[in-house]
Amino acid sequence: MAAKDVKFAGDARDRMLRGVDILANAVKVTLGPKGRNVLIEKSFGAPRITKDGVTVAKEIELEDKFENMGAQMLREVASKTNDLAGDGTTTATVLAQAIVREGAKSVAAGMNPMDLRRGIEIAVAAVIKDIGKRAKPVASSAEIAQVGTISANGDAPIGKMIAQAMQKVGNEGVITVEENKSLDTEVDIVEGMKFDRGYLSPYFVTNAEKMTVELDDVYILLHEKKVSGLQSMLPVLEAVVQSGKPLLIIAEDVEGEALATLVVNRLRGGLKVSAVKAPGFGDRRKAMLEDIAILTGGQLISEELGVKLESVTLKMLGRAKKVVIDKENTTIVNGAGKKADIEARVQQIKAQIEETSSDYDREKLQERLAKLAGGVAVIRVGGATEVEVKEKKDRVEDALNATRAAVQEGIVPGGGVALLRAKKAVGRINNDNADVQAGINIVLKALEAPIRQIAENAGVEGSIVVGKILENKSETFGFDAQTEEYVDMLAKGIVDPAKVVRTALQDAASVAALLVTTEAMVAELPREAAPAMPGGGGMGGMGGMGGMGF
């Protein structure tokens, strides 16, 4: 086991504080509409330019191990806020730095760190309650656009694009962000249920130009197992032929004699048919087949339920207005399922999302929910260079996360105003224990940090801005750093999602309180390099070669 270096008390806190300051100072230059970019070296390819706090925080690794521990704890603040709210990482970092610095001063002055921590927790609880009271629900598409615009750094087209995508797919829908090959940024809406399985044979293609299968007013047979024999399928095929409508078969697989017969029927024109594999694997495949059954008003043919393929009737088949299948994907549009059944299934999936602790499972459940409840929108981010596209993609992702958070918990005045106004709620708290009160006062002072930083990044004195806002009695009065004017923040559309502000403060205070109560730090001592091997003394027995006449 390697030897360790241990630092105590003031020495430990000083080193830790240096690390906190290095990371926070690199991150906080990005805050606000006039925040600057940070350029990050990459081991290969062009450097990355970003205005995203968590991206900067993740890149910082310091040489001094004690300083690095402080920096890594602060990085944890940004990461946690990003995971929970998807935005507000820079605000969280600025708040954490302010709490740690004031806390370290108080500890150095002889106050009890555990009492300080209690005071910090009491004050944070009061602020969160205050933010909850101030939050205003997001009602219109215009308000969603405002949130997106602010989070994308004043880029109005991005805000509008996100609002448009949310309007199309609903709040439950999935919106993904991808890089575009062209210069333009655009929204692509996929209506209906789309899954990543294509046709099993190119002979099913109905549109040779696009190489797609297009089936209108179609019957859908959903089978849990493989279909390989023809005999069991004959009754249902004959019934579909008589109805004169096309048929789509979704099963674990269709192979052998069954697939050959379907292809021959399709080519002879007797039956307009196509077959695809069921999406997903194992239990997830079964769940997705059940989703499709509910969406199309059909029944999943499963031997567990006592239904065999031979006994299937037309009533058991699902229906849809249109199905489009290409080489890789299948899209079912306007399924004939009952609204009440679909809604019940949506609620069931929502309950599973609440219960699951696995991020992977949650993501898959959300995908299923979106396919049932609304659809999928893809925002394709374009730009002139790869560096520009990546920078813009960071901003679009932040804006998307912010709008989702706004829909969940509502909006509050932006630009650091909500935290500044919460000072009133904290100021009302009085505690008999002087050290606990000092902890409350630490948060009271830290609540000014984000608005001061926004002002300073805009080249304005932070303390003057804070003073002017607090003088005004209006709860929504604040500083527009873009125009350097004092305005009504809600009327101007400068808003923050309440969830982002709340999460930023909670995560900042949680990690900062841990740092304030740290009394010792342990790090591995750097290993001394092993001495180099002594130089070789030549090959033995070669000494007599000196006389050779070279």
Swiss-Prot record:
A single GO molecular function term of this UniProt record: unfolded protein binding
One Gene Ontology CC term in the entry: cytoplasm
Subcellular location: Cytoplasm
Domain of life: Bacteria
Enzyme class: isomerase
E.C. number: 5.6.1.7
Catalytic function, reaction form: ATP + H2O + a folded polypeptide = ADP + phosphate + an unfolded polypeptide
Organism encoding this protein: Rhodopseudomonas palustris (strain BisB5)
UniProt protein name: Chaperonin GroEL 2
Gene3D superfamilies: GroEL, GroEL-like equatorial domain, TCP-1-like chaperonin intermediate domain
Parts of the chain that traverse the membrane: none
Subunit structure: Forms a cylinder of 14 subunits composed of two heptameric rings stacked back-to-back. Interacts with the co-chaperonin GroES.
